[in-house]
From Swiss-Prot:
Protein name: Equinin B
Residues in the signal sequence: 1-11
Record key words, sorted: Antibiotic, Antimicrobial, Disulfide bond, Immunity, Innate immunity, Membrane, Secreted, Signal, Target cell membrane, Target membrane
Chief location bin: secreted
PTM field: Contains 4 disulfide bonds.
Localization: Secreted; Target cell membrane
Propeptide: 46-71
Record's keyword annotation contains Signal: yes
Species whose genome carries this gene: Actinia equina
Its job: Antimicrobial peptide with inhibitory activity against both Gram-positive and Gram-negative bacteria (E.coli (MIC=0.25 ug/ml), M.lysodeikticus (MIC=0.25 ug/ml), and V.alginolyticus (MIC=0.25 ug/ml)). Does not show hemolytic activity.
Length: 71
């Protein structure tokens, strides 16, 4: 699974938080988890959420990670 690596301490915290969050949200769906983690990182690191979702245009769930539903 490709996870965005960030060298800052903040990035490590985001990675742990997002991996835990997305594993709970998408326990059986690797694609869901991957999208969730990518979005979660964007929010966590303060990037524009729209840019995090550009490669997922077919995915209608462009919402805050804590509202992300498992499908």
């Amino acid at each position: 699974m490709a996870v965005i690596m960030v060298d800052q301490a903040e990035g490590g915290q985001c990675q742990r938080k997002c991996l835990g969050h997305c594993s709970k949200k998408c326990p059986k769906h690797p694609q869901c988890r991957k999208r969730c983690i990518r979005r979660c990182f964007g929010y966590c690191l303060g990037d524009e959420p729209q840019q995090m979702a550009l490669d997922d245009e077919s995915d209608p769930l462009v919402i805050l990670p804590n509202n992300y539903n498992d499908y």
